């Protein structure tokens, strides 16, 4: 029986929770032992956790699948390859993957959501919801996070020129976006600004921003709550359900990529199939862009 460790950034985020659930379900379906661990958004903790697993004198997993909090941990990756442990990175490109693939027989590759396309869809949602343009509060993930950077880049490619962006920073959690939005709302200059839409790079941050507006001064609250709020991840029981309830105007559905990662790693180890260096999952708008334009 194969055994994989799945290291995720946090358990305080519905997408990461779905990543964990999808990993466990896929492991059960394929007869693979899955151990899910969380780094609590701490890059040093994640590095230490994985290095201890790689260097453990007794049991070692057949593969490690991880979504980096900070860097892609090149030294830990090399140690894993040297120990014959498969290495899969989620939602990140890593320059060392080709070198890792040359080092030994253990498979190594990356599986990512198409973050540039996710951003493009968010820009198109802005166009659909704001046909006359307007001011958008855009809540991004961490400044040093490549997924956040790519989503922003994609959004800038497709948003209309008459849509003006004000960016705030979050940490992929509801509470971080709540604090960022609450601080911004209290600024006198912000209270005078017209807000036509609030868009966040994940659904939990969109909900945090909405909660901050709901708790704001009544004059601000009533004005801004009329604006559409949009997010990203689009899980069936959370993001999509919030759209159906009218809490969010739209989301971007991002399939969990732990499923693809585990399937590819099993195929590589059990059947000797050489995996692609990078596999991308395909996002989509919910509701569709056509429905949003009506």
PLM features per residue range, with description:
Residues 1-22, 26-30, 34-50, 67-71, ...:
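Extracytoplasmic "Venus flytrap"
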Residues 2, 139, 158-159, 253-294:
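Hinge/cleft segment of the Venus flytrap/periplasmic-binding protein
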Residues 15-30, 118-122, 146-163, 176-180, ...:
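Short, solvent-exposed amphipathic alpha-helices that sit
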Residues 28-43, 135-138, 159-178, 225-226:
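Short beta-strand elements in bilobed, periplasmic/extracellular small-molecule ligand-binding domains
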Residues 46, 109-136, 177, 181, ...:
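Hydrophobic alpha-helical segments within soluble ligand-binding/sensing domains
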Residues 50-64, 190-196:
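Short acidic/histidine-rich motifs immediately flanking catalytic phosphotransfer sites
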Residues 66-85, 155, 166, 170-241:
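Hydrophobic alpha-helical
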Residues 76-117, 236-241:
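Flexible loop/hinge segments that line or gate small-molecule binding clefts
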